[in-house]
């Protein structure tokens, strides 16, 4: 077992970002728990916490330089946000505001959020956006930004996707949905099987466009658990009735051609099945 977890950690370290999400899902399927980024637990590479648990590395966060990571590793653990922001041994020109912002939005500072904060957005605004220079300023910020509350699920998803380059599939496709897809043999869109015709994906962006004749159509950018981005053209749509939700999983039966790629025709609620 020890050898296995060592191998998994090495595998996750070596896989390129384009295949990282697939590698993480593979590790989960083999019974390993993947813990999120954490200023007190994450290292430079995938860290083994126990025989079944690994934690993501700080190096996956865009905007986190080596010098900022050095400061964290040298002076942790941090039990409170005060210990993190006002540590006389930390060189804050290295662990600067940009690094704090990236750490916080990537969820790596979640353990430092206590009941003084109404949510993660309140915490982020009071500690990173308006970075307090003194302890007194932190108290003032906590009161000042109290109404901020929490980030939305969509904001959290976008932060992780943009800051780490890895789309957090598990935040959108839970284990129950994944089990059903596996049970019925529905592949992700990047593994589309023309004979089966069915696939699933997560919508990241929808753009309205018009043909040369002025007919409206959508271009949906989608992703799946292989971290492959794909475009789907949706023809004959009605903008008043046809809504495709961002960051939600869908099952669909698209057409595929070498010229046009993937496309669907007609009413969205008939061509696209919202999962969950």
Feature locations, PLM:
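Noncatalytic, beta-rich nucleic-acid-contacting surfaces in large DNA/RNA-processing enzymes
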Residues: 1-276
């Amino acid at each position: 077992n020890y050898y296995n977890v060592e191998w998994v950690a090495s595998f996750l370290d070596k896989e390129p970002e384009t295949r990282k999400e697939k590698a993480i899902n593979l590790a989960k399927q083999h019974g390993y728990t993947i813990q999120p980024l954490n200023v007190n637990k994450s290292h430079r590479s995938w860290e083994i916490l126990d025989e079944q648990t690994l934690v993501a590395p700080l190096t996956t966060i865009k905007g986190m330089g080596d010098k900022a990571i050095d400061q964290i590793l040298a002076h942790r653990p941090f039990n409170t946000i005060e210990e993190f922001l006002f540590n006389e041994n930390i060189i804050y020109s290295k662990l600067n505001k940009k690094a704090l912002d990236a750490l916080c939005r990537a969820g790596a500072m979640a353990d430092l959020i206590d009941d003084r904060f109404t949510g993660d957005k309140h915490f982020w605004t009071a500690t990173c956006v308006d970075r307090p220079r003194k302890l007194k300023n932190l108290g003032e910020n906590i009161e000042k930004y109290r109404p901020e509350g929490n980030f939305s699920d969509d904001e959290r998803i976008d932060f992780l996707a943009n800051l780490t380059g890895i789309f957090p599939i598990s935040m959108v496709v839970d284990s129950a949905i994944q089990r059903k897809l596996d049970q019925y043999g529905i592949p992700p869109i990047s593994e589309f099987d023309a004979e089966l015709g069915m696939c699933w994906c997560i919508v990241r962006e929808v753009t309205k466009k018009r043909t040369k004749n002025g007919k409206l159509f959508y271009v949906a950018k989608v992703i799946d658990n292989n971290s492959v981005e794909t475009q789907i053209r949706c023809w004959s749509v009605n903008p008043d009735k046809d809504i495709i939700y961002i960051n939600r999983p869908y099952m669909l039966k698209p057409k595929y051609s070498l010229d046009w790629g993937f496309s669907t025709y007609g009413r969205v609620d008939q061509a696209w099945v919202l999962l969950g």
